[in-house]
Amino acid sequence: MSVIIALAALALLMLAAYRGYSVILFAPIAALGAVLLTDPSAVAPAFTGVFMEKMVGFIKLYFPVFLLGAVFGKLIELSGFSRSIVAAAIRLLGTRQAMLVIVLVCALLTYGGVSLFVVVFAVYPFAAEMFRQSNIPKRLIPATIALGAFSFTMDALPGTPQIQNIIPSTFFNTTAWAAPWLGVIGTIFVFCAGMLFLQRQRNKAQRTGEGYGSDLRNEPETAADIKLPNPWIALSPLLAVGIMNLLFTQWIPQWYGKTHSLALPGMATPVTTEIAKLTAIWAVQAALLVGILMVLAFGYKAISRKLAEGSKSAVSGALLAAMNTASEYGFGAVIASLPGFLVLADWLKSIPNPLVNEAVTVTLLAGITGSASGGMSIALAAMANDFIAAAHAANIPLEVMHRVAAMASGGMDTLPHNGAVITLLAVTGLTHREAYKDIFCITLIKTLAVFVVIGTFYATGIV
């Protein structure tokens, strides 16, 4: 019964998200409904001590990233930079390669360390302009961005600095470059299968006469009478964000050391900060500030006429996206504390094959919590020692366990209630009904990829 309660809460939230209801409202309803059916006296403590605690913690860490990312994306849009880059890309590659261009831009940014949430805000103006000029249905933009930002550069490509590839290293004593050949094989599979699917959907839309669409929401705005800047100038802030993110990641620990104690005159006691835990977040924030200043410096004349209105729109978008994702985070924390979740986790331990056990466990928990990093963290915290023992017994290198865990986390995490999916749809102005089925097909490809990698390892022994 406890498992049914946990799964029912998940089903309710997924249904609410798919039908367009606010996740900010339904995430606590679904989570606390499950608590009510488990232990009615625990509802209020669970809401304050678990749901709100995790939700507020997420906002504390990530809202500045959402805000700066939204402002950066809006300035890219108002300055005409997005139109300039799209025009140059179409001249160079033609309209047939619009999807490939967006996938590669997303992949380069995420592999450079830019948060996938930031990529959504930054790339959407380019994607919308390119899809409009190529007359590709707007509903395919989320799936295209998901393929580039939420898949192979998130967890498969060796060396990616995304958190999904870093978490396993702390449990298996490996590096971000673990099992490089298996990672490359997984990357090729996801990229090729994803591009074939997207091209198939585009061709299908063309045969039925479906174009970009009309009466759409959240359409990027660029004044028609502005002179478009040089595409290299337009591209420079985007490149700067990726490069400066890498540089600040190296510089911040050198400036502050391992910890920093803040002692201002009005503070009763000093506040000590562990720099390692915040380096990645601070680096992204600083890099985005550099990008924003560059866009303002190069395109202020075009931006100034709509800066006030555009900044309000960016703040509203950032608030909605951050609150949606934070609510998901709180939901996952509550569900993970229920007995049904523990029963499910114990059942998963019974799968005999170590790699299949790990893959199924991580991807299911990522799906239930709606978070790749959250599901993987829960799975590895509870079962890493069992996975390591089973791997040693079966002579499986821990590098392979690392790569399988990372890729499995990026499988079923993109279900309808996933925070990144909800953010992506909110930013693009689309609904689950309009765009989620294509995202789900990318999700299936991602989920299948980890089992392709497992099969490749057993067939060839390649690592």
Set out the residue ranges of the language-model regions.
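Short helix-coil transition sites and intra-membrane helix breaks within transmembrane domains
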Residues: 19-23, 59-62, 73-83, 109-122, ...
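Hydrophobic core segments of alpha-helical transmembrane domains in multi-pass membrane transport
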Residues: 5-17, 28-37, 66-71, 105-110, ...
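Alpha-helical transmembrane segments of multi-pass membrane proteins
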Residues: 96-109, 136-153, 179-188, 354-368, ...
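Re-entrant/interfacial helical elements at transmembrane boundaries that shape
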Residues: 70, 84-86, 117-130, 159-171, ...
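Hydrophobic alpha-helical transmembrane segments of multi-pass integral membrane proteins
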Residues: 63-69, 92-129, 322-330, 351-389
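Interfacial loop-to-transmembrane junctions
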Residues: 89, 93, 424-445
